[in-house]
Regions:
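Hydrophobic, well-ordered secondary-structure elements that form the walls
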Residues: 195, 222, 244
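Carbohydrate-binding surface patches
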Residues: 125, 131-134, 139-141, 177-216
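Extracytoplasmic/secreted cell-surface and envelope-processing proteins
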Residues: 1-9, 32-37, 56, 205-206
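Catalytic cores of secreted or luminal carbohydrate-active enzymes
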Residues: 126-175
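C-terminal beta-strand-rich structural cap/linker in extracellular carbohydrate-active enzymes
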Residues: 232-254
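Glycan-recognition surfaces
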Residues: 20-138
Length: 254
């Protein structure tokens, strides 16, 4: 770790001396826990895991994050190994969950290695939702000259991007975590909250979210950021979530 810290600090110092505003991303794949020291040595973002592949999850079980180098990390793997680092993120220093694979559809190349056979549009939309609420830098890697309608819809959703770019800079915290569900809460600069509801299972499920269970008391207006409309008001949300889908809501106190 100390060798890595020394080397990255040398690079950060050189970038500062250039007199230009340059973002410095630390990439050692999370092996040396850069969230603990990345900002200290001058980094603005640091990778949390092995490289992402174009798939939902690793097809082989892994015991720790390092094993993802061999099995290939999918969307769900990177999410799971990035849940505990919210305290280290904020304006000017971010946990980088790697690139967006939205719209790749199994394209050959590094993203297609280690079982990267592609994802469904539902899974790509989930990545956009999850990376946004987790404040990960958003870097599209598809060919923007040849985007289909679904890829454009996912990548260009201004309401979703606004959650990622919110000035408060708070990373979401996972309030519910089990084999079937993840539920995330992220406070926003204007007092609203973003909530993401991920169905981890291979089938559609009905979900009932009581906002009080998430630490949010009172009544809220519930806006679905993918449907672009208000879908309810009150102290809870009920609805169906498709397999591997992530619902993303903005809650406004009423």
């Amino acid at each position: 770790m100390e060798v890595a810290k020394t080397r990255y600090k040398i690079m950060a110092d050189a970038l500062r001396k250039s007199g230009r505003n340059i973002s410095f991303g630390i990439c050692e794949w999370g092996d040396r826990k850069p969230w603990l020291w990345g900002a200290q040595v001058g980094g603005q973002l640091w990778r949390t895991t092995a490289d992402i592949r174009d798939k939902w999850k690793s097809l082989q079980p892994v015991k720790n994050a390092r094993e993802l180098h061999g099995t290939g990390a999918g969307i769900l793997d990177i999410l799971d190994y990035s849940l505990d680092y919210a305290a280290y993120a904020g304006p000017g220093h971010w946990n980088d969950m790697d690139m967006l694979i939205v719209g790749l559809y199994g394209k050959k190349g590094p993203s297609g290695d280690l079982g990267g056979v592609g994802c469904t549009d539902t899974e790509y939309q989930s990545q956009m939702s999850l990376w946004s609420i987790m404040n990960s830098p958003l870097a599209a890697t598809n060919d923007v000259r040849k985007m289909n309608a679904e890829t454009k819809r996912i990548l260009l959703n201004e309401e979703v991007i606004a959650i990622n770019q919110d000035a408060l800079g708070k990373q979401a915290v996972c309030k519910i975590k089990n084999e079937s569900w993840n539920v995330f809460v992220k406070p926003l600069a204007n007092g609203d909250f973003a909530i993401a509801v991920l169905n981890r299972t291979d089938g559609s499920q009905n979900s009932k979210i009581n906002f009080a269970d998430l630490g949010l008391n009172g009544n809220y207006e519930i806006r679905d950021l993918w449907e672009h409309k208000v879908v309810g008001k009150g102290k809870k949300w009920n609805g169906k979530v498709k397999s591997h889908e992530t619902k993303l809501f903005r809650l406004k106190k009423i």
